[in-house]
Amino acid sequence: MVELRILKNRDDWLKNRTRIGGSDAAAIVGMNPYMSNVELWEIKTGITTQRDISEEPYVKYGTEAEQHLRELFKLDFPEYEMHYAENNMWTNDKYPFSHASLDGWLIDQDGRMGIWECKTTNIIKSMQKEKWRDRIPDNYYIQLLHYFMVTEFEFAILKAQLKSEFNGDVYIQTKHYKIERADVEEDIKYLADAESKFWEQVQKKTRPALLLPEI
């Protein structure tokens, strides 16, 4: 059974983030460029504590931009019904090791439920922009698979704002990516198995073999 809880405040939400979240998932399968699966395991087992990045400028920008990007999406895509609640947390008793907190959730014209995710990124190098060319970067794709797994929704839409600066001018490019659950069922199953194995390693305090992302 899928359950949605709305926690009373951010502190309560943080206290309840005791399982595997969407931003953790890519590290488990070695696709997070910022954290390895071993580093995540050390955090989940209490060996180390997770660094608080909430005051980093890029994180604050993304957090403050989110509500505006959500409203823009509603204007640009009125065929979708947008829903959002602050401090939302989804759980699924099929996957007791995981939870999901969504940027939004959608209902399409056929009544299907969907995930809405937004990303803001500052493009400094051409290689960063290349990762968004006709595809979603691996770590964000894995995050969406995690959300599919927990929510059992039928589709996902990711809105990406790519920001770059040149000669004092700011350039903004917006991209939208849609994924149908039916097209990624095998990947969802693969991730669910990987998360289950990882959580067993956390509970037994068995250090996993190091997985590194491809450069």
Each language-model region and where it sits:
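Charged, glycine-rich intrinsically disordered N-terminal tails and low-complexity linkers that flank
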Residues: 1-64
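Generic detection of long, well-ordered alpha-helical segments
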Residues: 31, 59-67, 137, 185-192
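Generic structural marker for isolated residues within well-ordered, non-membrane alpha-helices
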Residues: 38, 70, 144
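Short glycine-rich, polar/acidic loop-and-turn segments at beta strand-coil junctions
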Residues: 45-47, 67, 71, 86-88, ...
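Acidic-basic catalytic patches of nuclease active cores, encompassing PD-(D/E)XK
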Residues: 59-83
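Nucleic-acid nuclease catalytic cores
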Residues: 76-102, 106-199
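Non-catalytic C-terminal interaction segments of nucleic acid-processing enzymes
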Residues: 193-215
